[in-house]
């Protein structure tokens, strides 16, 4: 029987031609032995654990933050009360990403934007307000610091506050991010340290956590940020593992941490779950397969506690539309379904108002409810890897892994992941895909309900964008003045000098950063040290 009876070829987002149906003969020969494995067994594509979500439901892990630290604190408590099982702090992007204080001219010029995309946190005092009353000792928390140069400040502030409250860092659960895909590919900032110092920072964080915070995930490579920039699912996989190789090779070169422990530290990653939910489920399966193969073949690591990839997933914010925004609840549910079918360990669902603003309280609540309905009402948690054995799913899983390895090798021919960022090669690949997707939408090949088909002349459900608070800049300005006026200036000066000295040497910067937090050194002062010592990245993007 002819498998593609029509003349028109159909392709997945990764450019894989899809058949109208699949049979056993379509499954690649090398993949057949993998199908015989059980969930929780190498090569792990079938799932992290044999009992799956029966024994451990995925973590409901929503990004949250806006306005003042107390606003973010209130929203996190609201989400925890509504059933969130972990929390993610978001720092203000205007100040945090650039390591600016609010009195920096670039921030003052955009004062109305301060606090729109996270809470303003310039010193340890702000972090203390933001985490007041939060169960940081028992709940898995994300301390913020998604951008590389901001991560040491965000992490050290969180850890120092925890210490001051009597919590043992050796038992503190949580994660950092410090993501290269966000920093140098997805959201390139005006002033950012170059990629080599950025690699050094992440290696420093990994080594510091190995010594003092064994339950903390030091860095989390975010395929999400590469995908929302334009990379296809296979490219998202390839770029994530190319990034991981840079980290592991650097840790191996430095020789301060056992490579098996370093691999475990790098084995908590995040992906985007987009609307093509079967392909996304296959992507998660392929990711576990690739990580297992990468560690075994390149580094000789087969320890199941290390070779079994841990995955956080966020639904694609870029797929949410401002037209007919309530449709986005359906989109979010389907994207979440793909992530869960793929066996992720934690999940965040983008708000239905994503295209308009940061999430309102109601949008945030609905993101939690979507996950709770999936967990409690659908029976999806009853069986591990429910798609396993499907001719289509197994074939597509193998094809995605194969294409992803091809992209991985393309990156290596560019000189590696960092070189591909520095040259702009990765940016070009993302831009090409963005243009193709735009043209597919323009000519109707890619349908988006409410946008290029089935539009409404009048929207029956108006959704106002959530504007946060209007006093974030003014309050942050007064708090900055208060810190500078009342801190122990000699201690702050000494700590800042030590940080600069360590930045200029090959000394791990994190002990000095911890001292700087205790001495109430501010974010902008730390950023000034970075700019003086490292300069700024020579971005390949022309604006």
PLM regions: where:
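Catalytic alpha/beta active-site cores
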Residues: 1-280, 298, 305-312, 340, ...
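Short acidic (Asp/Glu) and glycine-rich catalytic loops that position anionic groups and cofactors
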Residues: 56, 106-109, 136-138, 182-183, ...
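Electropositive phosphate-/nucleotide-binding environments in soluble metabolic enzymes
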Residues: 70-73, 121-124, 152, 196-199, ...
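Short beta-alpha connecting loops at secondary-structure transitions
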Residues: 112-116, 182-192, 228-230, 271-276, ...
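Generic, well-ordered alpha-helical scaffold segments in large soluble proteins
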Residues: 66, 75-82, 124-134, 157-161, ...
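Flexible glycine/proline-rich, aromatic-decorated loop/lid segments
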Residues: 261-263, 301-314, 323-355, 359-384, ...
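Phosphate/diphosphate-binding loops
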Residues: 122, 150, 162-164, 187-209, ...
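Flexible, glycine-rich loop/tail regions that form catalytic "lids" or insertion modules at the edges
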Residues: 2-6, 10-29, 37, 42-44, ...
């Amino acid at each position: 029987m002819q498998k593609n009876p029509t003349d028109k070829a159909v392709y997945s987002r990764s450019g894989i031609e899809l058949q109208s149906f699949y049979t056993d003969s379509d499954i690649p020969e090398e993949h057949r032995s993998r199908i015989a494995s059980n969930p929780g067994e190498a090569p792990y594509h079938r799932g992290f654990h044999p009992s799956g979500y029966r024994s451990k439901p995925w973590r409901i892990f929503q990004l949250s933050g806006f306005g003042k630290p107390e606003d973010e604190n209130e929203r996190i408590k609201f989400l925890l009360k509504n059933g969130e099982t972990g929390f993610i702090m978001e720092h203000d992007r205007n100040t945090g990403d650039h390591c600016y204080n609010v009195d920096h001219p670039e921030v003052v010029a955009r004062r109305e934007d301060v606090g729109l995309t996270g809470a303003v946190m310039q010193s340890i005092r702000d972090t203390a307000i933001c985490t007041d009353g939060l169960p940081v000792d028992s709940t898995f928390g994300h301390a913020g610091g998604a951008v590389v140069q901001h991560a040491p400040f965000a992490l050290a502030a969180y850890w120092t506050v925890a210490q001051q409250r009597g919590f043992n860092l050796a038992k503190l659960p949580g994660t950092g991010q410090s993501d290269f895909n966000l920093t140098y590919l997805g959201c390139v900032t005006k002033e950012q340290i170059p990629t080599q110092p950025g690699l050094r920072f992440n290696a420093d964080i990994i080594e510091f956590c190995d010594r003092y915070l064994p339950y903390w995930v030091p860095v989390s490579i975010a395929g999400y940020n590469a995908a929302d920039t334009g990379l296809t699912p296979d490219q998202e996989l390839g770029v994530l593992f190319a990034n991981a190789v840079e980290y592991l090779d650097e840790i191996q070169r430095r020789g301060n941490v056992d490579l098996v422990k370093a691999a475990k530290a790098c084995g908590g990653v995040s992906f985007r779950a987009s609307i093509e939910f079967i392909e996304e489920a296959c992507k998660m399966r392929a990711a576990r397969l690739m990580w297992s193969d990468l560690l075994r073949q390149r580094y000789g690591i087969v320890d199941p506690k290390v070779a079994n990839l841990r995955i956080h997933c966020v639904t694609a914010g870029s797929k949410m539309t401002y037209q007919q925004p309530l449709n986005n609840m359906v989109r979010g549910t389907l994207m979440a379904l793909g992530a869960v079918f793929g066996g992720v360990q934690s999940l965040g669902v983008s708000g239905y108002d994503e295209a308009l603003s940061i999430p309102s309280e109601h949008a945030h609540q609905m993101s939690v409810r979507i996950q709770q309905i999936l967990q409690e009402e659908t029976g999806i948690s009853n069986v591990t890897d429910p798609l396993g054995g499907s001719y289509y799913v197994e074939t597509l899983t193998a094809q995605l892994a194969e294409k992803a390895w091809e992209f991985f090798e393309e990156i290596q021919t560019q000189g590696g992941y960092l070189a591909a960022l520095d040259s702009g090669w990765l940016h070009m690949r993302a831009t090409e895909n963005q243009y193709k997707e735009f043209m597919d939408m323009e000519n109707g090949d890619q349908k988006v309900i409410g946008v290029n088909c089935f539009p409404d002349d009048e929207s029956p459900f108006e959704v106002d964008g959530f504007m946060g608070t209007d006093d974030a800049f003014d309050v942050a300005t007064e708090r900055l003045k208060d810190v500078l006026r009342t801190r122990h200036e000699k201690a702050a000066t000494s700590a800042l000098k030590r940080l600069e000295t360590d930045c200029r040497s090959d000394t791990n910067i994190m002990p000095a950063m911890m001292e700087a937090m205790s001495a109430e050194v501010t974010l902008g002062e730390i950023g000034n040290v970075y700019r003086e010592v490292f300069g700024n990245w020579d971005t390949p993007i022309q604006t």
